[in-house]
Amino acid sequence: MPDRFRSIVRGDRMPVDPAEQIRLGRSLVTVSKLSLGGGPFGRALDPDREGTVEAIVQRAWEIGVRHFDTAPLYGLGLSERRVGRALSSFKPEDRVIATKVGRLLRPPSGPDTQPVFDYSFDGIMKSLDESLARMRVVKVDILHLHDPDDHWDEASGDGYMALDVLRTSGVVKAIGAGMNQSEMLARFARETHLDCFLVAGRYTLLDQSALAELMPLCSERDIGVIIGGVYNSGILAGPVEGAHFNYRPASAEWLAKAQRLEAVCARHETPLKAAAIQFPFAHPAVATVLSGVRSVGELDENARMMAFDVPADLWRAIRTDGLVPESCPLPGGH
């Protein structure tokens, strides 16, 4: 067992190794099973050292994380600047940086900056150039269309064309789309040749709405899946009254289901978060879980949850209790 895990693994079993490198779909990019999301880096963090982006990225590197995700929208460029600065001491060939396009910051800096939707060919090129400047890097590895929910025609037309040109010319290694819905991602899978998808919140222990259509398409077409929102806005971190699901207060129905999942986990002496973060890896299309954190402590907890020894009986109970569809793969083949 690698020394870096001896302090965070229960027993001698390691169900999921956060540092394991996996090829991302049909692309030539490999990502660590645990990836670091830069969403929180666009907001104010704890003032002490543990809360700094540099400390979080350093600890992530020690754990074995090599895939780092950001976007212009996160803090209106602040996340990209912080991620670029924090990764500057690591060799470019050893790290994987992903960012997103589809929103230009106008003006590019200053107190009046606002995000402006733009999935045009020129808009994509400008967005990437500005992201590279903010991060002070020459290139990124993965480039996603960011939440094109109301912009299908432009994103799938000129936007996709721009991404394809960037991939073909070697400016980026992989192209994808990141969304909080699965229906449009399934359409991208059918009508384009994207390499990967960032699926946020739609393939989790609580919500498997991507299972029926999107996930089979990804398996069939070798599209790598990056899972975001594994705790569904916090409800799978603690399903208490007032918990959030999909960025808003959870309905009684979602809260009740999350509490049933928590009860199954409690019977098997397993944290709900451990089951939640390990669940997606049972699907063959899933390469990595992307998790945003605000402190080194949160990062270490995610690594512990990923490496926790989840009993096989827990997965069987989840199936028996009807908490996932019969067609849903579970760890260990249960």
PLM region descriptions:
Residues 3-13, 18, 52, 148-334:
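Beta/alpha (TIM)-barrel catalytic core signal, keyed to glycine-rich beta->alpha loops juxtaposed to Asp/Glu
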Residues 39-51, 110-123, 152:
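Active-site mouth loops of central-metabolism enzymes
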Residues 1-95:
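N-terminal binding-site loop/beta-alpha segment at the start of enzyme catalytic domains
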